[in-house]
UniProtKB/Swiss-Prot annotation:
Keywords: Decarboxylase, Lyase, Pyrimidine biosynthesis. This is Orotidine 5'-phosphate decarboxylase. Its EC number is 4.1.1.23. Signal peptide: none annotated. It is an enzyme of class 4 (lyase). The gene is pyrF.
Length: 307
């Protein structure tokens, strides 16, 4: 099962860190752009080649120390068909090095549309899992659930997201006296029972932001079967202490995504005097190692078992 493979990858790499590949052309090292523009031209094709080359460098630097990468489709979709080519090439390269690939697509629509989105991603061998938006109702995510089970894939449903505005809808009290995100959590946890693996977790997981630690603590209890994909660590403000309650006492239950803080580590105050732009990939590796160590130390302090 997807979830069993994910947990085994976490154990093998001794890390719950997922690297988010969200490249921005304006932040891409100039030497990479020079190579790409010389090869493809200073145009959309060249831009997308630069994004791919940047990603390739990051993947080469971290594939042996992380279980998975998460690729946010918007950073590629913005460039049309060439962007999608870079998106798929990135996934293909990551898979070739043994990484699990999460397509961060956050799809959510009526059933017939959802079936097509699911066909595009969950029926594609390049992707191990996708993110989905369940806020249109249970019927809109069932095509993903059915395909996840059929094709041995995973989904992570948005429950409590890391953005500040999540409270505008997710924190509204329902007529039952609970928050909307709690109602969604209960729905996802119930659905997750259909795909439980040998470690007690389901291939149907949840997105729970690092920026809401108190809510995460509640959700860990309300969603005992669900593995959490945790965004918001690092650049968005989430800390090691904030994410501890996403884990169980065995050190599992969550994968922690970091995008900007890793892939642009060479530009951060901590690393900018150590690594140049030519060493952006080495800086990313150093940041992952640092992040993994901090998380595992946090788990040990909680008397949990580190990865």
């Amino acid at each position: 099962m997807f979830i069993d493979r994910l947990i085994e990858n976490i154990k093998s790499k001794k890390s719950p860190v997922v690297v988010g590949l969200d490249p921005r052309i304006e932040m891409t090292p100039q030497f990479i752009k020079d190579i790409a523009f010389k090869k493809r031209g200073e145009n959309i094709e060249g831009v997308c080649e630069a994004l791919y080359l940047f990603n390739k460098g990051i993947i080469d630097a971290v594939y042996d120390i992380v279980p998975a990468v998460k690729i946010q489709v918007a950073f590629y979709e913005a460039y049309g068909i060439e962007g999608f080519k870079a998106f798929f090439k990135t996934a293909e390269y990551a898979k070739s090095l043994g990484l699990m690939v999460i397509a961060d697509v956050k799809r959510g629509d009526i059933q017939e549309v959802a079936k097509m989105y699911s066909k595009a991603y969950l029926q594609n061998q390049l992707f191990d899992a996708i993110t989905v938006n369940p806020y249109m109702g249970e019927d809109t995510i069932m095509p993903y659930v059915e395909d996840a089970i059929k094709y041995d894939k995973g989904i992570f449903a948005l429950v409590k997201t890391s953005n500040k505005g999540s409270k505008d809808i997710q924190d509204i009290k329902t007529t039952k006296g609970e928050y909307v995100y709690q109602s969604v959590a209960r729905m996802i946890n119930r659905i997750s029972n259909s795909a439980i693996g040998k470690y007690g977790y389901s291939s149907i997981g949840a997105v729970v932001g690092a920026t809401y630690p108190e809510e995460a603590k509640v959700l860990r209890k309300e969603m005992p079967n669900c593995f959490f994909l945790v965004p918001g660590y690092g650049a968005q403000g989430g800390t090691v202490e904030d994410i501890m309650d996403c884990f169980d006492e065995n050190g599992f239950g969550a994968i922690i995504n970091s995008s900007r803080s890793v892939i642009y580590a060479y530009q951060t105050p901590y690393w900018k005097d150590v690594y140049s732009e030519y060493e952006y990939a080495q800086a990313a590796r150093a940041e992952v190692i640092l992040m993994t160590g901090m998380i595992n130390n946090g788990l040990v302090k909680r008397k949990y078992i580190a990865c």
